[in-house]
């Protein structure tokens, strides 16, 4: 493999055995592609905004004399960029402008004669835009729209599993689900009649809907039944014989062939052998006794030819009297319905008998009554209602997906078709459910991923936009019908408010629009790849059963079987598998390699869950020879959702990668294959809660996906084009672009601005640091700067800690963690948290609030950190209770005391008119002020601090832009100088020229002269562009802010808090091994090895066997080897060994392992590159052991040998306190530990006096409410068990809800009198009132 200059800085040793056929696709594409489809102009009009507009327009007036047509739309440019939106607290959106055409028709002239056409561009609200990283900024906060897994539109057949009826009979049902519109259900009842429901309302006999579709009884019977033909001959009947129909029946008469010999005697069961004999003898007719027809149903009406009287009506039972009547009337041929209990049930025939309607109108009225109970039906209303239910494109849409699923399920050859239902569709569904009831077909599996599809951002936004448009449509139609249209323009008809409101509601408050989880890069990516079954149109937690939540065979390679939350949402919220993507219909697909005649090709095809069922698919870990032919004869594979063994020649596809089945979070766990799934689930979930540490450190033992994740997450800065680094500082990187990647006539400079110390959604710190140096070559895709939790472009969520598995004086009992003081001293787990505190000055009824340093009754010392405007200065160190922003609020006139009146008379000032309402630092918070923002309403005078901040921002903008301009100008000038050099000018001549003259020289070569003129033109453009950009920036900075009504000023103060690790913080490994720090132990007391190196963390070995996450032990061994190799390299460098020896050792390390795919050609590295690589490997060689394809035990032992460590992975340890050796050797190595965002500082809380609940008068609960500790029934039992009566009494009275007792006790404590008198708890009064509310009077006897 060829490595770029920056990749050679540190290469991860990969133990993967399988070739990488396909790179993991871009991780955020599910979000970005979906939204792109929504906003991009689609000429076909099948999706996005275009589809929404075309579905609603044209809007015709009621009279038909005018209509409003849609022409095209365009999205404008957003006013503020993403960062400005976050600071100002506004939505990152672009205005939508739509070109509409209003057409007026001439009433007098012939139909369709156009009288007037007016075209105009109309503003239709703002559409929120997606940032480059797949998020939305709504009101200043980053949000993610989670994709939804919902039941695909189409037709589904199911049964109730025998749960509806007490007999346990299985009742079948069919449901047609449209994309929008009414649901149509067919269901059998226990008596085998077929019923229909519309929108889950009252059920009606299913034949009513057929009558409403203009089918007569005769036609209905012909649709669903075959006929049996009889001829009447004297005393017998002759039946037309279809031998197959007799199978399984018991002969009620002798069956004879044409010659009259008996084939089946009466009372015998007819078998397949008998049928074959009948077919051989070509018997076409059978004589049957007259009684045979009795009880069968007539297939048509039989009418007396003379009188016209109906002798036997269709679907009525035939009796001997009916036969006699028919004979008399001279009717010789009779048809009956072919009904057979086994496989041709009389369902429709039975249903027709229940059906009270006889014609279309009655059926329509019946449907109308069911849909609109209590309304008087009229013919027109009933027809219109039925028409609108399933046959109107405005009200009903199966959608493209729905039509495809519908047609495929009912074996209709074409995938395309109308979005509304037809008569034939409804009949086909009824036929199919009868087919299933007859036992010829299977019901569907609704949890199969072929029946559930993904609805992503774009589709949901489009639906919401359509909702807004439909609201507008009603208003437009009314306006078109009113008033004089000659005066009106399209703009006067359209009100953009409903559209904006619908879109805003979706992005702001939909269940699927979620506050982004921004703890670390992994949590961001996982959140964007989350697939939820909840939300509008989805399931609810309460209704979701076990089957929906369970892992389904079709999840393979599509949804991760591991990563899902614990708790009530388990299985309802899933994560996309690493290689999965959605197809054009919204179904999940996963890639497979094609296999032809047992030979694996590199051709990759994506298959959906439905397609996959047809093929035989082998796993990725099968043995293959050098030619790609499968070695084994019998191969483990999957077919139709089952695991089986098949011959190599039968295999059609093979998995692309062993990591294919799991999500990115799960594939970050090394040795995942050795962990129990429950613990792997916790490991995958807890990595998302890791807080970015002060100094990120790459994991020594990783899986090789760390780089992909860091790059795709968008937290690192990635080079867009190749070149070399021209300039680097903490906030900017400048890359001079390679000649061959330049666009003609451009400066060839790329500038990357870095994000510094900003706050994330979870209050962690986002900060980017350059990881490149001036002069270094860069290729496209190289990482130029690290973000939070990344190290040299690798995801780095935690720290590599030296671990020993041993008990230590009970300090690691029950998953507690003992850590060394050194970890705290070296700031290994120190994290920075940034809090945003806001102070809002409002206009109140009594006057406006004021931000000032002049605060009543506050001493000088408390104001020491404020400037003259009353706002804290940047860099101030503050603690709980300090004033950050001084604010006074006017208060109403109160009754003055005589002393105050005297003071007022002497000094004549109204000092007491305002009260202090300053913003203070919350208790228990201590930190440094890193930024202050002041937002002032338009028209309100800016204070001194606001002006200062503005000037500072303008100066910064000018500096940034002028530096950018200088860099770009230099780029243009250097290209011009090169041209002049090539045209015969000497270097001294060029150097002596003033800058402005370089571009105005005259050259003989015409082509070069043209190029120079182009450069001069470009220089002018740059200048103009600079002025324009600066003016826009200045205007944005100085303009007033759009604040909420009644708000005059907002001051936001950002406070950076440094949190060191301490007892009570939660830590975890990557294998679900979590625990709480119990003690920080002095370094000298920690166990140490023979070299005197103490361990960092002591874990309890009992946490491993019962949890079955052995992956952590293998990680510790491998970590020890990786660190040991790093130590060896360090020793070599310190001893200044020959470079060849270092090169040889590094080469040996990278070549270790059986059949590993990675090839690192250390020999081709220059001496400098080897030296830099060695320097970067001093802390340990990073290792990749991919999930299901990782390092074997043998390879771990080889690594330990290379590192000069015992292959057992165990060392002698000595007790730090006594110096004695422990009696057994201890497993010591390196494990990657994470500090989770469950910090004791955020949880620790104690209540003194505080607020009480209104009804029970008990203290509130929780830190946010400054609540008390709950003393529940179990705690009461404990005190009862100990007989601690007085303690229990005060817990239940004065410390809780004895209102008088607690007030009295407070006074007593203040007076120094430590007495208490418990009274009646308020909760007892509540109980009395509850009982009285039931009408039972209870009174207490006061004795």
Curated annotation (Swiss-Prot):
Keywords on record:
DNA-directed RNA polymerase, Nucleotidyltransferase, Transcription, Transferase
Q: How would you summarize the oligomeric state and partners of this protein?
A: The RNAP catalytic core consists of 2 alpha, 1 beta, 1 beta' and 1 omega subunit. When a sigma factor is associated with the core the holoenzyme is formed, which can initiate transcription.
The name this protein goes by in its record = DNA-directed RNA polymerase subunit beta
Alphabetically, which GO biological process terms does the record hold?
DNA-templated transcription
Source domain of life is Bacteria
- Give the residues annotated as coiled coil: none
The reply on keyword Nucleotidyltransferase is yes
Which Pfam families does its entry note? RNA_pol_Rpb2_1, RNA_pol_Rpb2_2, RNA_pol_Rpb2_3, RNA_pol_Rpb2_45, RNA_pol_Rpb2_6, RNA_pol_Rpb2_7
- GO cellular component terms listed in the entry, alphabetical order: DNA-directed RNA polymerase complex
Q: Which HAMAP family match?
A: RNApol_bact_RpoB (MF_01321)
Would you identify the family this protein belongs to, as annotated? Belongs to the RNA polymerase beta chain family.
């Amino acid at each position: 493999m060829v490595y770029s200059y920056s990749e050679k800085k540190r290469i991860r040793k990969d133990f993967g055995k399988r070739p990488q056929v396909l790179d993991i696709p871009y991780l955020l594409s599910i979000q970005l592609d979906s939204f792109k489809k929504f906003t991009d102009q689609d000429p076909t009009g099948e999706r996005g905004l275009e589809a929404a507009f075309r579905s609603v327009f044209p809007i015709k007036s009621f009279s038909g004399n005018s209509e409003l047509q849609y022409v095209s739309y365009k999205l404008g440019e957003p006013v503020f960029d993403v960062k400005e939106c976050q600071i100002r607290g506004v939505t990152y959106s672009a205005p939508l402008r739509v070109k509409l055409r209003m057409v007026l028709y001439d009433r007098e002239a012939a139909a369709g004669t156009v009288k007037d056409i007016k075209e105009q561009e109309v503003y239709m609200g703002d559409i929120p835009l997606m940032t480059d990283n797949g998020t939305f900024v709504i009101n200043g906060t980053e949000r993610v729209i989670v994709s939804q897994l919902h039941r695909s539109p189409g037709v589904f057949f199911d049964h109730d599993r025998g749960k509806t009826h007490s007999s346990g009979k299985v009742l079948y049902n069919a449901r047609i689900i449209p994309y929008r519109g009414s649901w149509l259900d067919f269901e059998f009842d226990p008596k085998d009649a077929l019923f229909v429901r519309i929108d889950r309302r009252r059920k009606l006999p299913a034949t009513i809907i057929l009558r409403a579709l203009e089918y007569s009884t005769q036609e209905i019977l012909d649709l669903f039944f075959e006929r049996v033909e009889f001829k009447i001959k004297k005393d017998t009947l002759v039946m037309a014989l279809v031998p197959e129909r007799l199978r399984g029946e018991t002969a009620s008469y002798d069956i004879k062939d044409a010659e009259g010999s008996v084939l089946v005697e009466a009372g015998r069961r007819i078998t397949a052998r008998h049928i074959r004999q009948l077919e051989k003898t070509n018997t076409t007719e059978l004589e049957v006794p007259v009684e045979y027809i009795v009880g069968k149903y007539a297939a048509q009406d039989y009418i007396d030819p003379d009188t016209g009287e109906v002798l036997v009506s269709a679907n009525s039972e035939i009796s001997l009297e009916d036969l006699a009547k028919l004979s008399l009337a001279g009717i010789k041929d009779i048809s009956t319905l072919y009904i057979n209990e086994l496989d041709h049930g009389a369902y429709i025939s039975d249903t027709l008998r229940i059906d009270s309607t006889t014609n279309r109108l009655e059926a329509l009225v019946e449907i109308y009554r069911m849909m609109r109970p209590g309304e008087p039906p009229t013919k027109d209303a009933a027809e219109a209602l039925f028409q609108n239910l399933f046959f109107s494109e405005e009200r009903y849409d199966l959608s493209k997906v729905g039509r495809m699923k519908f047609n495929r399920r009912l074996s209709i050859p074409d995938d395309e078709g109308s979005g509304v239902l037809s008569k034939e569709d409804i009949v086909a569904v009824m036929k199919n459910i009868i087919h299933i009831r007859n036992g010829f077909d299977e019901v569907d599996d609704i949890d199969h991923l072929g029946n559930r599809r993904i609805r992503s951002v774009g589709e949901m936004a489009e639906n919401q936009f359509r909702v807004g448009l439909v609201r507008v449509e009603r208003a437009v139609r009314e306006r078109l019908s009113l008033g004089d249209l000659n005066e009106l323009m399209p703009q006067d008809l359209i009100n953009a408010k409903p559209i904006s409101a619908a879109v805003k509601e979706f992005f702001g408050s939909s269940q699927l629009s979620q506050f982004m989880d921004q703890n670390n890069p992994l949590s961001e990516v996982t959140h964007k790849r989350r697939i939820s079954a909840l939300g509008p149109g989805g399931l609810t937690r309460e209704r979701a059963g076990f089957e929906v939540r369970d892992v389904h065979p079709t999840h393979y390679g599509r949804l991760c079987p591991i990563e899902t939350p614990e708790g009530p949402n388990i299985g309802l919220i899933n994560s996309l598998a690493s290689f999965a993507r959605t197809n054009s219909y919204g179904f999940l697909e996963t890639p497979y390699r094609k296999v032809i005649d047992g030979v694996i090709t590199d051709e990759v095809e994506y298959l959906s869950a439905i397609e996959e069922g047809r093929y035989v698919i082998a796993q990725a870990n099968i043995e293959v020879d050098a030619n790609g032919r499968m070695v084994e004869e019998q191969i483990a594979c999957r077919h139709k959702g089952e695991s089986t063994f098949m011959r190599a020649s039968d295999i059609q596809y093979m998995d692309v990668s062993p990591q294919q089945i799991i999500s990115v979070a799960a594939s970050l766990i090394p040795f995942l294959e050795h962990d129990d799934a429950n613990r792997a689930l916790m490991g995958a979930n807890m990595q998302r809660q890791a807080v970015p540490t002060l100094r990120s450190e790459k994991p020594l033992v990783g899986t090789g996906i760390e780089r992909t994740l860091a790059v795709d997450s968008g937290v690192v800065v990635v080079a867009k084009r190749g070149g070399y680094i021209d300039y680097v500082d903490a906030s900017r990187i400048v890359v001079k672009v390679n000649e061959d990647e330049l666009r003609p006539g451009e400066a060839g400079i790329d500038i990357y601005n870095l994000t510094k110390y900003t706050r994330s959604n979870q209050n962690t710190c986002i900060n980017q640091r350059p990881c490149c140096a001036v002069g270094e070559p860069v290729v496209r895709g190289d990482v130029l700067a690290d973000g939070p939790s990344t190290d040299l472009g690798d995801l780095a969520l935690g720290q590599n800690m030296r671990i020993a598995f041993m008990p230590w004086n009970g300090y690691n009992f029950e998953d507690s963690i003992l850590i060394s003081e050194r970890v705290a001293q070296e700031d290994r787990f120190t994290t920075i948290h940034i809090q945003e505190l806001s102070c809002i000055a409002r206009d109140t009824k009594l006057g406006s609030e004021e931000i000032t340093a002049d605060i009543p009754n506050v001493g000088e010392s408390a104001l020491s950190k404020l400037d003259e405007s009353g706002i804290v200065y940047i860099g101030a160190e503050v603690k709980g209770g300090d004033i950050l922003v001084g604010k006074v609020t006017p208060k109403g006139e109160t009754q003055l005391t005589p002393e105050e009146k005297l003071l007022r008379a002497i000094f004549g000032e109204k000092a007491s008119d305002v009260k202090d309402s300053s913003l203070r630092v919350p208790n228990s918070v201590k930190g440094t002020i890193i930024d202050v923002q002041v937002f002032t309403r338009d028209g309100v005078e800016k204070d001194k601090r606001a002006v200062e901040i503005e000037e500072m921002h303008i100066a910064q903008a000018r500096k940034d832009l002028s530096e950018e301009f200088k860099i770009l100008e230099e780029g243009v000038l250097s290209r011009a100088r090169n041209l002049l050099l090539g045209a015969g000018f000497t270097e001294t001549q060029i150097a002596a020229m003033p800058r402005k003259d370089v571009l105005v020289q005259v050259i003989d070569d015409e082509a070069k002269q043209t190029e120079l003129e182009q450069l001069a033109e470009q220089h002018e453009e740059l200048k103009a562009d600079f002025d324009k950009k600066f003016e826009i920036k200045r205007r944005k900075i100085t303009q007033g802010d759009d604040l909420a009504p009644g708000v005059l000023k907002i001051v936001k103060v950002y406070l950076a808090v440094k949190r060191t690790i301490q007892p009570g913080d939660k830590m975890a490994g990557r294998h679900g091994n979590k625990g709480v720090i119990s003690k920080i132990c002095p370094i000298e007391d920690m166990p140490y090895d023979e070299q005197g190196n103490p361990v960092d963390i002591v874990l309890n070995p009992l946490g491993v066997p019962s949890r079955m996450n052995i992956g952590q032990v293998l990680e510790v061994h491998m970590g020890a080897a990786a660190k040991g190799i790093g130590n060896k390299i360090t020793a070599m460098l310190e001893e200044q060994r020959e470079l060849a020896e270092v090169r040889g050792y590094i080469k040996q390390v990278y070549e270790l392992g059986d059949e590993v795919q990675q090839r690192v050609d250390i020999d081709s590295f220059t001496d400098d590159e080897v030296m830099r690589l060695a320097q970067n490997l001093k802390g340990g060689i990073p290792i990749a052991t991919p999930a299901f394809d990782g390092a074997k035990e043998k390879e771990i032992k080889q690594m330990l040998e290379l590192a000069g460590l015992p292959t057992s992975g165990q060392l002698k340890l000595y007790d730090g306190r006594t110096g004695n050796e422990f009696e057994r050797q201890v497993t010591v190595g390196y494990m990657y530990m994470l500090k989770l965002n469950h910090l004791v500082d955020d949880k620790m809380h104690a209540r003194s006096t505080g607020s009480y609940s209104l009804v029970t008068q008990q203290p509130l609960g929780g830190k946010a409410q400054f609540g008390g500790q709950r003393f529940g029934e179990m705690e009461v039992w404990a005190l009862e068990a100990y007989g601690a009566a007085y303690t229990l009494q005060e817990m239940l009275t004065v410390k809780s809800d004895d209102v008088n007792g607690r007030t009295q006790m407070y006074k007593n404590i203040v007076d120094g009198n430590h007495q208490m008198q418990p009274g009646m708890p308020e909760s007892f009064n509540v109980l009395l009132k509850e009982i009285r509310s039931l009408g039972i009077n209870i009174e207490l006897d006061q004795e």
